[in-house]
Structure formats: C-alpha cells, structure tokens
C-alpha cells in the first residue's frame, strides 16, 4: 500500500524542495511502517488498462555524443523528422542549461521542432499555455536531476494529468533518464544506500508520478551497486515489479506489454510474485532481510520481458517504427 500526504496540507511554499524537505521525514516513517493507514491513495487515481504509448526508462548517462543509440531511437519512435519533442528539464538544478542541452541534441539528430517546457513552480504546471504546448508533443522527455524536485513540481497538477493521458492513449511517447526514469512508478526510490545487505533502512521511498503504476524503477543500477536497495524497496512493496536499469541502457515499455532492453548495459528484473516468506515486518530497520523465492532476471540488449506473462525472450524482434 502506498500513502500520500496531500500537498494542500502545507500549502504552496516558495520552493517545491521545501515541501519535500518537510514531508520527507513523514514519508520515511510511513514507508517504513506499512501498517499505518494515512490517506490511502484511491485505487482509481492511477488505474488504467495499460499504456498505448511507448515509455522509455533510461538508466542515466546515456550516450549524447557518438552513436546516441537511445536518444536516436526515442526521436525515431516519436515521429522522426516530423516529431515534436517536449523537454521537461525540471529535475535539474540548472533546468535552462539542461533544456538547451537536450534541445541541441534532438535538433542535431534531425528533429525539426523541440520545445523546452520549463516548469519552475507548480503554477507553471497549471497554465493553459503550457498544457497547449504539451498537447502538440509527439515525444516528451524528462531529464535527470532530483526526482523529489520533479515529483514535487508535477504531482497532482493538470500538466501531469495531461501527460499521463497522452501517454496512456498513445498520443505521445515518453522518455525519462535518471531521475526522469525514477519517477515513472506510483512509488519511487527517493534516495538510499549501497554496499549493504538488503534492509529496511537502506532505501527511502516517496510518491512517484504513476505513469507506470505497477513498476518500481531504479537507475545507474549496477554502476552504483543498487541491487540491495531495489530488493529492500520491493520488500516494502511486493505488489510492484522492480526494474533496475544500468547507465546508457533503456527499458522500453511497449504498448503490447513487452519490456525491451536497448543499450550497452543490462536491465535487472526483481519479481516478487512467488515470494513465500519475508521477515520485513518483524525485524528492526537496520537488520538484514530474509526473502524466500525472489525471482531475478538480468537482460541485455535485445532481450525482452513480458509484463503480462512474466516470461523472458532472448533477442526479440523489434517492432516497426510508429
């Protein structure tokens, strides 16, 4: 169960970071105490029957200079030369510079129209002009940075509602790298440690954007030794599928329910469906976790995972471009 503390309880502060700084200790306490029942999210909030638009979750540090395999694929799937790419650089501490970086990359790849959607505060995400610009986009790209900042800016705003609608209805494809990938689930990893055995204190969880409600994403995965923290997160939310994505690697969530791997690293699937026992509810926060029958897959470029049947396929055939 995931719980939300409504932003309205603290009002609109000058900075979304202040909101999350205020809420983070509360969210940590709630996520480490699953028996608490504070304002549970309505099941209808993120309920959908599957997304018709491609979602590309990138593990960060994607190639921006040479082959640009992942970013080129994103542009191709968004419509090629005729694509309209909207860049949301709001997770970055320097959103203007980040926006210009991806603007120049996508233009260099060949996209004629790239729009930088600067969301500096929650009021920006409510403007009709911003919604109109988003509605024209065939591809939407969320940059890296701080996933807490991005979530604080977009969560429960008209911009997020429209973004989800466009992706779920197949009107746009969505790409997110690093923090932009971490926010895709209903629950997201806000921060955490590494180089430890899985335990309840290893990861801090927060509310994501709910674009892929059944998935919990981690990024820079093997590069930063994050398997233990993803397992710790999945132990707290065994109804989610853990997806750990390496740098310069992409998990492509296709409309047909296939997860396809693209890039030079790997994607790790942590599947808790068959877990028969965990001591999660019975140990102190710093004690190691026991988890029985946790299933793990490591997939490389071209491999696929069926999100409906939970079967893996080696080097599956690429679909035609949209």
From Swiss-Prot:
GO terms for molecular function: peptidyl-dipeptidase activity; serine-type peptidase activity. Keywords: Hydrolase, Protease, Serine protease. The keyword Protease applies. Its EC number is 3.4.15.6. The keyword Ribosomal protein does not apply. The active site is at residues 178, 196, 220. InterPro entries: Class_I_gatase-like (IPR029062), Peptidase_S51 (IPR005320), Peptidase_S51_cyanophycinase (IPR011811). It is an enzyme of class 3 (hydrolase). CDD domains: GAT1_cyanophycinase. One of its GO terms (biological process) is proteolysis. SUPFAM superfamilies: Class I glutamine amidotransferase-like. It comes from the Bacteria. Belongs to the peptidase S51 family. Exopeptidase that catalyzes the hydrolytic cleavage of multi-L-arginyl-poly-L-aspartic acid (cyanophycin; a water-insoluble reserve polymer) into aspartate-arginine dipeptides. This is Cyanophycinase. The gene is cphB.
